C-alpha cells in the first residue's frame, strides 16, 4: 500500500497538495479509516484521469511505420488503426499474412498501407464489423487495393491478404507472358478494344436505375466535398485503364487517354462489361441540372 501511494504521488503532483490539505503527515492519524478513505479517493481521481486520456487517444488513428526483414526489407509497411487498438498480436498477424502475400512479388512493390477499423456493436449502430483495407503502391503497375469486412479482425486481414496475392500473381503472369512474346512485337499493329459509345440518355438511365445506397441516420451529415485527392495521371491505353480499374477495385476510373490526350472515365456497367465516357470533340457537353435525391450513406474515408 505504501509503494502504491508513493507511485501515485510521484505521477500526479496534485495528489500531494490534496493529501497535505486533508492529512497532517507529521502526526499520527487518529482515525485510520478516515485516512484510508481520503487516500483511496485521491488515488481514484488520478486513475480516472489516466483512463480517460487513453480513451480519448484511441479516437485518433494509430499510425505505425515499419519494414520487413529479409526479401521484403525494401518494402515499406504503414499500419493504421481507427477505433481499435493495434495490439502486438494484431501487428504480428498483419506482418505475417500480408508479408506472405507480397513476398513472392516483392520486386513489384515499394510500399504497403494497411488500415484497420471497427464499426457497429458498441461503437455505432449496426452489427459488429472489423474492416481491413490494404493499398499496395507498385513500382511500375500503379496502385492495387482491396478491402474486406468480417466479424473478426483477423478474418478480415486473411481475406484481404488472399485478394492481394491473387492480384499480384496476375500482374506477374502478365509481365512474364509479355516478355515471352516480345520478340517481333509491333505495338502499332495492336488495336485496343473499341470503346462502347453511349448516349446521354443511356448514362442518365443507368444513373436513375442504379440501386439506392443503404442510408443511415446522421443529423450531422454535411453535404459538401470533404476530401480532395491529387494523382499523377500518365497516359494509358484503354486496356491498361481496364487493368487499373480492376486493381483498385472501384466502380469507375479516370485516366488520360494515350491516343487523344483527353481525360476519359471508364466504369463498370451493371449489365456487365465496361463503359467509357469521352469528351465530345475534346469539349465536354454541359448537361442540364437534374433533381437527384441525396441519400445519406456511411463514410469510411479518413
Swiss-Prot record:
Which cell locations does it reside in?
Answer: Plastid, Chloroplast stroma
Transit peptide stretch: 1-66
Q: Which Pfam families match?
A: Ribosom_S30AE_C, Ribosomal_S30AE
* Gene Ontology CC terms: chloroplast stroma; cytosolic small ribosomal subunit
Record-level Gene Ontology MF annotations = ribosomal small subunit binding; rRNA binding
User: Mind listing the GO biological process terms from this record?
Assistant: negative regulation of translational elongation
Keywords linked to the UniProt accession = Chloroplast, Plastid, RNA-binding, rRNA-binding, Transit peptide, Translation regulation
Transit peptide as UniProt keyword: yes
Question: What's the subunit arrangement here?
Answer: Binds to the mRNA channel of the chloroplast small ribosomal subunit and interacts with 16S sRNA nucleotides at the A-site and P-site.
- Which function does this protein serve? Ribosome-binding factor involved in light- and temperature-dependent control of protein synthesis. Interacts with 16S sRNA nucleotides at the A-site and P-site, where it protects the decoding center and inhibits translation by preventing tRNA binding. Stabilizes 70S ribosomes against dissociation. May be recycled by the combined action of ribosome-recycling factor (RRF) and EF-G.
Please give the family membership noted in the entry: Belongs to the HPF/YfiA ribosome-associated protein family. Long plastid HPF subfamily.
Q: Which HAMAP family match?
A: HPF (MF_00839)
Q: What is this protein called?
A: Ribosome-binding factor PSRP1, chloroplastic
- The gene that this protein is the product of is PSRP1
Amino acid at each position: 500500500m505504501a509503494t502504491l501511494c508513493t507511485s501515485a504521488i510521484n505521477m500526479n503532483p496534485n495528489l500531494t497538495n490534496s493529501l497535505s490539505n486533508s492529512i497532517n503527515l507529521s502526526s499520527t492519524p487518529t482515525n485510520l479509516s478516515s485516512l484510508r478513505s481520503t487516500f483511496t479517493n485521491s488515488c481514484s481521481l488520478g486513475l480516472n484521469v489516466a483512463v480517460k486520456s487513453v480513451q480519448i487517444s484511441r479516437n485518433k488513428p494509430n499510425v505505425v511505420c515499419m519494414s520487413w526483414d529479409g526479401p521484403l526489407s525494401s518494402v515499406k509497411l504503414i499500419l493504421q488503426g481507427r477505433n481499435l487498438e493495434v495490439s502486438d498480436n494484431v501487428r504480428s498477424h498483419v506482418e505475417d499474412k500480408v508479408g506472405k502475400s507480397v513476398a513472392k512479388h516483392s520486386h513489384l512493390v515499394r510500399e504497403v498501407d494497411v488500415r484497420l477499423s471497427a464499426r457497429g456493436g458498441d461503437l455505432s449502430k449496426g452489427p459488429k464489423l472489423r474492416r481491413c483495407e490494404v493499398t499496395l503502391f507498385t513500382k511500375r503497375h500503379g496502385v492495387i487495393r482491396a478491402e474486406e469486412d468480417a466479424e473478426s479482425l483477423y478474418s478480415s486481414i486473411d481475406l484481404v491478404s488472399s485478394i492481394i496475392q491473387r492480384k499480384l500473381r496476375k500482374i506477374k503472369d502478365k509481365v512474364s507472358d509479355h516478355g515471352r512474346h516480345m520478340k517481333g512485337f509491333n505495338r502499332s499493329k495492336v488495336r485496343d478494344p473499341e470503346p462502347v459509345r453511349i448516349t446521354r440518355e443511356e448514362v442518365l438511365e443507368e444513373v436513375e436505375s442504379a440501386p439506392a445506397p443503404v442510408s443511415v441516420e446522421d443529423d450531422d451529415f454535411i453535404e459538401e466535398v470533404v476530401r480532395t485527392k491529387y494523382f499523377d495521371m500518365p497516359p494509358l491505353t484503354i486496356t491498361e485503364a481496364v487493368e487499373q480499374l480492376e486493381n483498385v477495385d472501384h466502380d469507375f476510373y479516370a485516366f488520360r487517354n494515350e491516343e487523344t490526350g483527353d481525360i476519359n472515365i471508364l466504369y463498370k456497367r451493371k449489365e456487365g462489361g465496361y463503359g467509357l465516357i469521352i469528351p465530345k470533340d475534346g469539349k465536354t457537353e454541359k448537361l442540364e441540372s437534374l433533381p437527384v435525391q441525396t441519400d445519406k450513406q456511411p463514410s469510411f474515408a479518413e
